[in-house]
Each structure stands twice: as C-alpha cells, then as structure tokens.
C-alpha cells in the first residue's frame, strides 16, 4: 500500500505504528517517549535483528539520518542547474526543429538565463530560434492552416505543438529587441485571437504549449483580446477534459472516466498531462494582470488543482504516471513530477499557495528530483518517453531522458532557488 491510498487507510501499519518515517526528528523522539512504537512492533518492521547489534540511540540516529532532508543553499541549487543544463547543451545540438518537445526545453533554458545571466546558455536558444527562422510551422496561406487533430506537417500552423516556440521567441525579443523575432508570432496568434473558433486546445498538453503564449502576447500588445481568447479556449478545454470532481484534467476526451479506466478501474489522470496544465496556469498567472476581469477564475483553477495534485504524491516524492492508480504503471517519473514541483513552487513564491501547507510536498519532490532523477553526469533520468498516457509495463529508468524532461527540471530548479531565497 502506497501514497494517497495508504494515507487514507486507518489500518495501514506504516501510518498507525511507524509515523516516524514521515515526521520530523522531534516527532521521532516524541513517539518513542510515549511508547507509540512498542518493541514487539519492530518484528513486523524487520528491525528486530538490528536491535541485537545496535542500541536504541543508534536506531534513532539511523532513522533520523535517513529522514532528514538535505538543507540546500541557493548557490548549491544554481550549481545543479548549471550541471544539468551544461550536460544537455554539450550533448545535444541547438539546431533542431521548433516542434513542442524542443521548444519545451527552451522554456526551461530561458528561465535559467533569467536566473544565471549566462550568455552561453542564452546563445543556445538564439541559435535554435535562428535555425527555425523564428517560426513554428511555416505554411504561409491561412486558408491551409490546421489544428483539429495531431499533425507535424508545416500546415499545422494553429496546432499548439507548433506554437509553444513563440514563448521563447517573445522572451528573446523582450531581451534583445528586433521585431523580426516576433513577426510570425504576431501573425499566427493574432489570427487565432481574432477567429470565432474556440476548439483549439483539445488535449491537455496544449494548455502549457499555448496558454502562456496568449499572456505573453498581451504583454507585448496590451490588447485584452488575447486574454479573452485564452479564457474562451480554456472553457472549451474544460468542457471536454476537466474532471469537475477533482479539478484534474484527463489527457483528452478519449480518456474521460468511465469511458476509459485505469488498470484498477480508477480515473486515469496522466501525470505529465496534468503537469503541463499546472505549469501552464502558473505561467499564465505570472503575466496576467490582477485587473483582468477573469483573473480570479484562473487563480481558483490553479489553487484547486494544486491541492488535488498534492494529494496524489507518493511518499518517495514523485507522482506515478497514472496519478490515482500507482499500480497501473508503478515507479518514478520525472517530467510530471518536475512540472508539478515547478507549479507548486511558483504558487508559494507568488503568494498563491500557503508555504506551510505545501512545503512538505515540495521538499519531497525536490529530494526525488535531485537524489533519484538526477544522475552523477548531469543527465536527468526517469522521464517517460513521448506519449499521451500511462502505459503498463513501459520501461522508465535512469537512462530515460528527454528534452522536455530537462526543461521541466530546470523550471523547477530555478523556482526552488527563488524559494530558498525567500525563506
């Protein structure tokens, strides 16, 4: 029994008889002092043999050392960021297409530049943007632009996977100037904002790919049509993917319960999909003005989702690929965990979430990201490959890396550095 299921079960021996593994050091002493952990219970915990060799003090010390979270400094976090990003950039060329997976990495890289002011890292994103001529999909004729199903062709101009690149192009324009950098973004997103259609975002990933583009376009133009279109498009997304009971999102209409169930007949919320959404909402609120009439709608959605996400975390700090059914595809996964960690950190850092309430969730997630996901080389492992659902039996291990997973890790790490400086 693990995770939320164990937390809700009064008969779970881990919870009722061995709370020291989730409490602070002072709680450990309190439990022993009040005799809430009788000697006989050690048998069931496979510690009886240890007591023959170690004193009770040694047992307490061992438990304390295993539980006590490392106390990070901002400088140490910055070192981790450099290690991860340097490893990625040294092993992967910048000159790749502007499709979503590469573009998601660059949203993390730009956050690194904002924090570290490392010109070499900035240059990596500039070279990527120049290679793609500051464009997503390149079809020139709006009459041929598509979006209603998945497509990697150059005519899928209105498909969100070809629009996430505009986030980085806009950021680079703000830093460096030159309107040629945003010419295509203005053309494509202006067309979408002016259109009568609102069914553009039919899969959860799009809420990270495009929602932040809309708020960045507002910042560029001071035109609320981008915010209004963001709201209208999101209402459509909610109508087909949002689970009203939990505040979480199904990946798309195919996965809505009970049409599709997890291996154990539960609602199948895909961690990376919901990670895209929570992170996207954080980015939206970053740029959305407090004065915008719909802003409370987005704040409520973000805070409700954050609490729903926190309830699904596993004791080891990660989220399983199927969030409510850990046994569907068991084991750690980094991309969803990193996006969740970023979203929760952003919420705390910007006063949208209570620090005391979410600090334990954040610290567990950060511990997983740095002690399990992060490899000695700087590689970020345990990233589920490109897909759209939790797949039973799929291999996800220390060698499983991906550009978007690195981007998610960098977002979380940058926000964690700020989190430490706010203490």
Question: Locations of the language-model features?
Answer:
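CBM-like carbohydrate-recognition segments
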Residues: 72-103, 111-160, 166, 172-175, ...
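Asp-box/WD-like beta-propeller blade repeats and closely related beta-sheet repeat scaffolds
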Residues: 179-212
